[in-house]
Every structure is written in C-alpha cells, then in structure tokens.
Amino acid sequence: MAMGDARTTESARQIAMVCLEELVRGDDRYRRIDEIVGDWGFVREAARPYYSEGVGRPSIDPTVLLKLMIAGALEGIGSMRELLRVADLRLDLRLFLGYGLGERLPAHQTISETQTQRFADGEVFERLFLRTVALCQQHGLLDGTHLSVDGFHAEANAALRSLRASLEPRAAEAEAEPGAGDEAASEPPQLRLAEPRSGPTPKRKATNATAVSRSDPDARLKGKPGQRPHLVHRGQVAVDPKRRCVAGCLAERAEGYEGDALGPLLDRVRFLLPELASVGADQGFAAERVWEDAAERGIIAYIPPQKTMLPRDGRAPRTNAQRLALAARARAKSEAGISAHRLRMADAEGVIAELKNHHGLGRVRCRGTPAFHLQLLLGCAAINLKRLAKHAPTAEQGIAAAPATPAAALSAVSNEPHRDQLRTTIRLGRKQLIWTASPSLN
C-alpha cells in the first residue's frame, strides 16, 4: 500500500457552505431530546413574569439559558465557564441551543445570574421538571402504581472552618414599662450565645445545636461514626421502577426526622400519579405518623420498622405505635414487601448514585437550601430527559421495544438467584432482539 499525501492546513482555511444540522448525527442525545420535548414555549411562559415588557434592551432567550443549564446537568459540568467552553466546541450543543457556527454563546455571568437571582424562586425549574414527568407519562415510561423513596446527603459549599457559635435572642428579664414600647422597638435585638463557651475550637467538637456556618447557614453537620463530619444538605427522590424515572424530588435541611419528607413528596406526585397504590422506603422513614399518614391517603407503605419500635421478648403490643410497627414488619416480610425493598435498592439508590456521580449532585454548587433545590430539580429533569432520549424514540419509530415489567410483577423475578435469568427473545426477520425483565433496566 502506498503512503498517502500529507495533509496541510490549506483545506481547513477554505470557505465552505455547511449546514449544522447535517453535521450532527440523527441519533444524537440532544437532537432526540429536542424532538421529544417539541415546543419549548412553556419556558418563555414561565419566565415572562421575570422580564419587563418593552423596557430595556432585549435579553437572551430564556429557553437558551435553560437549555444550557440542562446541558450542564446532563454532562455533569458544574462550572459555567467550563460548560461554555464545551458548548463552544461541540456541534450537537450548538444545534440544541439554536446557535450557528459563527455565533457567540452567552457569557457565563448571564447564566449564573439567571440561576441564582432571576429564577431563584424555582418556578421555571419546577415547570421544567413537571414537564419531563408529564412526557415520561405520555410515552409510557411510568407505571404509576409504586414509588421507591430514598434520601441522600449532598456536601454543602461551605468549609468546617466557617463554623461559629450560634446566637439566639436574649430573653427579657422583666416586662417593658407602659409607654416604653416605641423605644424598645427601635433598639436592636439583644443576642447571646446559644450555649456558653460553645464555639468550635480544636479541643471542642461543634454540633448543630452549638454552631452554625457563616458561609451557608442552612447547612448541617452530619457524619458517620468514626468519620469526620461534613456540612451537608439533604435531598429526597421518588423513583418509578418501570424505567427508573424520577417522579418527585425535594430538598431540605439535614435536620429533624427524615420520614417527615414523605408526606410532601406524596403531595407533589398525587396529581401526576393518581393511581399510586404503594410506596417503599428504608427504616429511616419508619414512624407512627408516617404509617398513619400513608393509610389515610390509601397508600400501602412498605417501610420496615426499627428494632426499638417493636415489643420486647415477643410481648403483646401495648401502644398504637407498637401495633403499627408489627403491621409494618408483616408487610415488609411479605412477598410484595421484599419486592419493594429490592426495587428501592436497585432504583432509588441507583438514581441517587447516578445523580451524584454523573449529574453533579455530589456537591452543592450554590449556598442555601433553595439553591440546592434548584440543582436537584435540574439533575432529576436531566435523568428524565435521558430516559426519554433512550426509550421514547423506539416506540415512536415503530421498532419493537421491550415491554417494561410492572413493579408488582417483579416480585416473581426477585426470588431468582440471578436477576437476569428471565429473558424473552423476539425475532424480527434477520434481526434478533433480546430484552431482560429485571429491575436494573435503565
């Protein structure tokens, strides 16, 4: 074989008429997302209250800003500067944003200001997430009868050295005299240390009751036994086991009881999933009020109780909490309860790992619980869009797709020694498609 001619830079300097749409593959992820979503007009409608009509110069299209944030969540890029460097070089992202080869992308300050200030209340991101859930339901990616719920901790954007002794208002020693109300109202409130000598020092351990972070007051100290504590925020996700789509999410402070988040999560999904019949969670959600609230909603809660909640030595239950704990243990040990437990481990914990490792939820970029909630909404919306790009087009193009196994039917599969033993083969002429009915399907 003869050696080919050497390539020079002359061909790269030539002017050519190219079409950006022809340079991007037809099965590109962002092209498929754009086709599935279709009309992005809901973004402009949700963002309209944040702009002035006819005042000032025209701003950048809010749809472009939101698409850039979606791309950052899909790529797992937290830095806006790095995101714009990547988007400037990639043809698929330029086509997704609607920018030509020679057009300059928005500045990184504009994107940061949009996320942290203009859309800080989260209404636009809530509309985006709800739209992705509705699209998943429209394309048959949601079963809607069972949800797997689990929580996780995301490291806050604050260091331990930012901890300072917390302050609380000083109680009045005596009641104010008549007529002195105006003078007392004008004086600033008197503060004192929450606990004397409670500030963190090298010899004194800080706790949430005695210290607060100056950088992020919403962050809380959490740590496993024997490990160094970290300042974290807590997030909750509700995952549908059919295609592991996220049906609901919630961000909160990492304090109090974890099970109190189950009620707000169910309130968020009750209109999207009216046929919801059961929910599965771990022992961290076990409590009397949680079981009672689920029963009032007509939902079966597969939440195993903790050992301290059960009667000792096999005695009869003496309180209502012990009776509910025994009933919860019976549900957890049933065939459906075992299936719900395995679904939670495979789906909810799998989605949490996906959020942390691939979508930037391992560490909070901004400060405060509301900012973490925006980041969580973007990450969950990115997961749903990724599921849509993978599964929705196959059904629309008429290609035989794997029928998803409902959550209730997976209990028969969960007892097998290997989760991928149940296989079905579909022959399509010369092609052969094999699908696996197991909870590990993406």
Regions found by a protein language model. Give the residues of each.
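Short, flexible loop/hinge motifs at secondary-structure junctions
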Residues: M1-L20, A401
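Anion-binding and metal-coordination hotspots
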Residues: A6, G76-L89, Y99-N442
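Generic alpha-helix structural propensity
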Residues: I15, D28-R31, F42, S59-L66, ...
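A general alpha-helix detector
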Residues: C19, V64-I70, T110, T114, ...
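Basic, short loop/linker segments at the boundary and entry of helix-turn-helix/winged-helix-like folds
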Residues: V24-I70, E75
